[in-house]
């Protein structure tokens, strides 16, 4: 049953006479404590926070002095006491509450400055189970929730970035804080505890291999606010989950304009794709527009791979995202800047390459320090009206699959290499996806069509356009291989690929008409390999 309210009006301005400071992150702590003292605020504190404040010569009272109880159990119990929570939760205009705190000698607390044990940091650094559990804060979230609930009389600060605003408001209002400001801080406080609990919940689900927990929490910390979202009439912000997977969220931006919503979405897609290619084996480049590849290629150098990728669809590559699986060097940079490019993302960039890119001031250059592991576990989430779709990350890798040759003719070694290449790319193309590949480069990509045969036809037409632009006598689909992200429901998609010039096919299989498709391949002397793994992408 819901708890009823006494409807006691909150004051607009509330004087801050007493503050409780208990922080794990001590950034800005001393300057903030000095400012509070200068504004006549009595400071209560705990453990290491109290020691830091006292060492700076600022008057501070240890919380054990008001509880009459020392810290116990390695600090697990220090603020879980009525003298603390009564001071945070007391409604100052309620006669019953006033009588209770007077009877029990509880002093009111007007400002709670709390930040939490670094659970998220420990989690993503791979701390062992016991260490991770020990970094679950109990008293901190309890104080944050108590003070934020009682924002009518208490201001709650959970982020050192807000210290300056608190001091400014105190000085502006002669030692008081306004209700609107206290509400704003309370909203942030509850968001913080929600995100913290979400991190704990998700870690526990992973720790016990619970793939579909009863309650699923997704949370992040605001990194940046964009000018707009996918379209100019939409608002947008970028939130970081704390996962250390190399990519756009963890990258260092060396130059260029702020990343837009679409930039981030496309850059993530590009870097995840190029990570499918082992940099110890080959250099690889992916060019992306609208989260779909315009061209992907591998070669002995990044420059060569870029030129091969660009040749697949030079028109669509204009204004695209370029992702590399190796360090950006001068030779590659000189080629990339010849075409208008929004973002370059790579594990690293040489000083010479940075100097070349610097000539294009708006071009964003991101370095990540590494590549994401395509085999790593993780989750992918998507909102729908009234719900959240959550699934495990598509971490299937073609090199790990048991490939089955189902036709009379087996692919040659060169065809098999290209087939694997094509299937890697197809995993990152919006369904229905058809990818033509020849000599380690895409030569035609058909994406996002409602029928597979249309994707095959579009990919072939793209190859024809690229050949015409390059002055070639015939499109490079002649003698190529083809990948399909899902099975061919009919033989028509396969026959379109054959018409385009494909000599070998890789697909998951699993259609009711697999026999018909295999027979059509045999009839045309096509080698076909089935993977048993589908890669739908929506």
From Swiss-Prot:
SUPFAM superfamilies: Cytidine deaminase-like, Methylglyoxal synthase-like
Reactions that this protein is recorded to catalyse: (6R)-10-formyltetrahydrofolate + 5-amino-1-(5-phospho-beta-D-ribosyl)imidazole-4-carboxamide = 5-formamido-1-(5-phospho-D-ribosyl)imidazole-4-carboxamide + (6S)-5,6,7,8-tetrahydrofolate; IMP + H2O = 5-formamido-1-(5-phospho-D-ribosyl)imidazole-4-carboxamide
Gene3D superfamilies in UniProt: 3.40.140.20, Methylglyoxal synthase-like domain (3.40.50.1380)
Pfam families, sorted: AICARFT_IMPCHas, MGS
Keywords carried by this UniProt record: Hydrolase, Multifunctional enzyme, Purine biosynthesis, Transferase
GO molecular function, one term: phosphoribosylaminoimidazolecarboxamide formyltransferase activity
Pathway linked to the protein: Purine metabolism; IMP biosynthesis via de novo pathway; 5-formamido-1-(5-phospho-D-ribosyl)imidazole-4-carboxamide from 5-amino-1-(5-phospho-D-ribosyl)imidazole-4-carboxamide (10-formyl THF route): step 1/1; Purine metabolism; IMP biosynthesis via de novo pathway; IMP from 5-formamido-1-(5-phospho-D-ribosyl)imidazole-4-carboxamide: step 1/1
SMART domains tied to this protein: AICARFT_IMPCHas (SM00798), MGS (SM00851)
Family that this chain belongs to: Belongs to the PurH family.
NCBIfam families: PRK00881.1 (NF002049), purH (TIGR00355)
Domain notes: The IMP cyclohydrolase activity resides in the N-terminal region.
Protein name: Bifunctional purine biosynthesis protein PurH
């Amino acid at each position: 049953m819901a708890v009823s309210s006494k409807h006691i009006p909150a004051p607009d301005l509330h004087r801050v006479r007493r503050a409780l400071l208990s922080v794990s992150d001590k950034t800005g702590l001393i300057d903030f404590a000095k400012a509070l003292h200068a504004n006549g605020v009595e400071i209560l504190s705990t453990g290491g926070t109290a020691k830091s404040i006292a060492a700076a010569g600022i008057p501070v009272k240890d919380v054990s002095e008001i509880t009459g109880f020392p810290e116990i159990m390695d600090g697990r119990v220090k603020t879980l006491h009525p003298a603390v929570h009564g001071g945070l939760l007391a409604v100052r205009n309620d006669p019953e509450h006033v009588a209770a705190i007077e009877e029990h000698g509880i002093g009111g607390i007007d400002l709670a400055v709390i930040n939490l044990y670094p659970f998220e940091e420990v989690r993503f650094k791979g701390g062992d189970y016991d260490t991770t559990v020990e970094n679950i804060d109990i008293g901190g979230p309890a104080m944050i929730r108590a003070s934020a609930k009682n924002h009518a009389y208490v201001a709650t600060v959970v982020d050192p970035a807000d210290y300056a605003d608190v001091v400014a408001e105190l000085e502006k209002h002669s030692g008081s804080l306004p209700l609107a400001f206290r509400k704003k801080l309370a909203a942030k406080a509850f968001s913080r505890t929600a995100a913290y609990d979400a991190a704990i919940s998700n870690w526990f689900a992973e720790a016990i291999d619970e793939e579909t927990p009863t309650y699923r929490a997704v949370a992040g910390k605001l990194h940046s606010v964009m000018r707009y979202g996918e379209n100019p009439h939409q608002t947008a912000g970028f939130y970081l989950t704390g996962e250390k997977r190399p990519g756009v969220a963890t990258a260092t931006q060396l130059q260029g304009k702020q990343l837009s919503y679409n930039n981030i979405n496309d850059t993530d897609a590009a870097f995840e794709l190029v990570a499918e290619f082992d940099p110890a084996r080959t250099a690889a480049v992916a060019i992306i527009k609208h989260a779909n590849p315009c061209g992907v290629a591998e070669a002995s150098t990044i420059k060569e791979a870029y030129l091969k990728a660009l040749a697949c669809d030079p028109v669509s590559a204009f204004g695209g995202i370029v992702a590399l699986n190796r360090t950006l060097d001068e030779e590659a940079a000189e080629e990339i800047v010849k075409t208008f490019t929004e973002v370059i993302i790579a594990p690293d960039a040489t000083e010479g390459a940075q100097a070349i890119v610097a000539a294009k001031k708006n071009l964003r250059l991101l370095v990540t320090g590494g590549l994401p592991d395509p085999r790593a576990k993780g989750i992918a989430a998507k909102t729908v009206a009234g719900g959240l779709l959550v699934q495990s990350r598509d971490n299937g890798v073609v090199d790990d699959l048991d490939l089955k040759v189902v036709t009379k003719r087996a692919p040659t070694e060169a065809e098999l290499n290209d087939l694997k290449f094509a299937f890697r790319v197809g995993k990152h193309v919006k369904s229905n996806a058809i990818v033509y590949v020849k000599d380690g480069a895409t030569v035609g990509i058909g994406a996002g069509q409602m029928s597979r045969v249309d994707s095959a036809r579009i990919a072939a037409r793209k190859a024809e356009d690229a050949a015409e632009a390059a002055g070639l006598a015939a499109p490079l689909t002649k003698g190529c291989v083809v990948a399909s992200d899902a099975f061919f429901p009919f033989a028509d998609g396969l026959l379109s690929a054959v018409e385009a010039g494909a000599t070998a096919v890789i697909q998951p299989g699993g259609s009711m008409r697999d026999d018909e498709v295999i027979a059509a391949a045999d009839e045309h002397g096509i080698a076909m390999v089935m993977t048993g793994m589908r890669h739908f992408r929506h």
